[in-house]
């Protein structure tokens, strides 16, 4: 619903428009709110990943513009000064720091998973690298180097597999042809379309 700046209708007319479009407006508001809060960092937030939990905690003993990291068992705690978390620049820096920490602590798991899936399908890869991009979650070079983003660690297990299997299919078809999708679907045990659709709807809890 668009109301131009030169609109001269009555308040009652505007109310009637809102009532007529109430359901659609609710859906739009819900979608916008979910997208906004999904990638927002705040005190007490817990982010669940396959390996465990990421906990964000405000702590007055932490110096300004600093982050203290503690790992115990299956949890990594990121502590920061309470006054910092309201800063958009600090949130951006904290997001980058969290992703670096994930890559350092769990990047080896993505490498192992990629090698295991390649071996399962009888594929040979030259190397596995861990990237940090959010827009491009995976890449396969013509020389057989597979790059998997650390952001994949934020995905559930089956979507991690989808990203990796998608790139492994590029070892055979360096395009997105019908043959490529047929092979990718084979690797995904018939779930390629469903997993692709699920990935498109996934809201990452951390955004750069």
Label each region the model flagged:
Residues 167:
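Walker B catalytic acidic pair
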Residues 1-161, 171-208:
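Active-site-proximal or metal-binding-adjacent scaffold patches in catalytic folds
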Residues 164:
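Walker B beta-strand of ABC/ABC-like P-loop ATPase nucleotide-binding domains
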């Amino acid at each position: 619903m668009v109301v131009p700046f030169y609109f001269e209708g009555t308040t009652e007319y505007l109310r009637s428009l809102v009532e007529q479009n109430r359901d659609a407006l609710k859906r739009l508001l819900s979608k916008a709110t979910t997208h906004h809060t999904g990638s927002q960092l705040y005190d007490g937030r817990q982010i669940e990943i396959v390996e465990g939990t990421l906990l964000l905690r405000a702590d007055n003993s932490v110096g300004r513009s600093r982050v203290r990291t503690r790992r115990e068992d299956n949890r990594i705690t990121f502590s920061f000064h309470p006054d910092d978390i309201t800063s958009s620049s600090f949130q951006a820096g904290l997001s980058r720091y969290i992703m670096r920490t994930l890559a350092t602590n769990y990047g080896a798991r993505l490498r192992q998973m990629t090698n295991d899936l390649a071996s399962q399908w009888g594929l040979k890869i030259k190397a596995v690298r861990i990237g940090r991009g959010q827009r491009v979650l995976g890449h396969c070079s013509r020389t057989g180097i597979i790059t998997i983003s650390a952001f994949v660690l934020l995905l559930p297990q089956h979507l991690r597999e989808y990203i990796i299997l998608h790139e492994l299919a590029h070892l055979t078809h360096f395009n997105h042809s019908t043959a490529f999708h047929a092979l990718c679907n084979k690797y995904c045990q018939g779930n390629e379309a469903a997993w692709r659709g699920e990935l498109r709807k996934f809201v990452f809890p951390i955004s750069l």
